[in-house]
């Protein structure tokens, strides 16, 4: 079974970039949602290997979402003793706030927004397996095929 990632971020373009990058370079599946309430429901419904939560979310703060899931996740998934690790998606103005919450052992870092591929792959290295055969985005060429 492939590892599954839960991504909660309000911006559809950012969710799309992160989802496409992870599925291109990591051997995983990604569920994404724009709001914290739906993320909470998904976390209780399915097992996950990693959470990626934006600090500001509609309806619920990303840190609060993580705290609630950390308490409920082991109850919803028998045999699991702790919730998966979390990476927070932060904007520049949230950097000071992130430093206050990074002490939690499950917090594996932060991804500055807008997302950058190298930062995302560095943060997920060791948390998600690499795609077989290196993965990557499809190769396109504008040059005509030469026999």
Predicted segments, located by residue:
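Two-component/phosphorelay signaling modules centered on CheY-like receiver
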Residues: 12-31
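Conserved acidic carboxylate
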Residues: 9
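CheY-like receiver
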Residues: 81-82, 129-147
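Conserved phosphoryl-transfer motifs of two-component systems
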Residues: 28, 49-50, 105-111
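Alpha4 helix (beta4-alpha4-beta5 surface) of REC/receiver domains from two-component response regulators
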Residues: 64, 88-110
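Conserved phosphotransfer microenvironments
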Residues: 52-82, 97
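C-terminal output helix
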Residues: 115-124
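Acidic, metal-coordinating helix/loop segments flanking the phosphotransfer/catalytic sites
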Residues: 32-50
């Amino acid at each position: 079974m492939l590892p599954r990632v839960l991504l909660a971020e309000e911006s559809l373009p950012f969710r799309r970039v992160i989802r496409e990058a992870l599925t291109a370079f990591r051997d995983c599946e990604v569920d994404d949602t724009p709001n914290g309430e739906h993320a909470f429901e998904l976390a209780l419904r399915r097992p996950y290997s990693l959470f990626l939560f934006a600090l500001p979310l509609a309806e619920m703060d990303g840190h609060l979402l993580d705290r609630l899931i950390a308490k409920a996740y082991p109850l919803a998934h028998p045999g699991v003793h702790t919730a998966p690790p979390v990476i927070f998606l932060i904007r520049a103005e949230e950097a000071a706030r992130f430093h206050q919450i990074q002490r939690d052992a499950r917090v594996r870092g932060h991804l500055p927004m807008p997302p950058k591929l190298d930062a995302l792959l560095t943060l997920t290295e060791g948390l998600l397996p690499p795609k077989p055969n290196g993965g990557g985005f499809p190769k396109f060429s504008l040059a005509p095929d030469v026999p």
